[in-house]
């Protein structure tokens, strides 16, 4: 089956494969997903801290097992003192409709902390059928 090039007048345009490779490799450097976090939890203690950056009330209703609640607005150096300087963090919020995880990631990066965002947030976690704590 032969494919014709995309019409340049259309909204969806073809991308340069090398540019696409660079783009998606960069995304994977900063993002993970619910499945990968779940697999890490199943295999033993992950080598990162899972931060639920939602409100305490939302956290209390249910959260990823082992996650620590630290709302994104409270991510400051003194609240990270309990974690080693080299600790890596995976942050999540309510879901794709929420930018709390992005805000948390910015704050952590500004504090020179390693961070990834868990795509899907708690909504994605529940959609996958994973247990809450």
PLM regions: where:
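Catalytic cysteine-centered active loop of the rhodanese-like fold, especially the PTP/DSP P-loop
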Residues: 80-126
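Short active-site oxyanion
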Residues: 44-50, 65-66, 88, 114
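Short loop/helix-cap segments at secondary-structure boundaries that form the rim of catalytic
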Residues: 59-65, 125
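Small-side-chain structural scaffolding
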Residues: 17, 34, 53, 67, ...
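Active-site neighborhoods of enzymes that stabilize oxyanions during catalysis
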Residues: 129-133
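Flexible, polar/low-complexity N-terminal or interdomain linker segments that lie immediately upstream
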Residues: 1-61
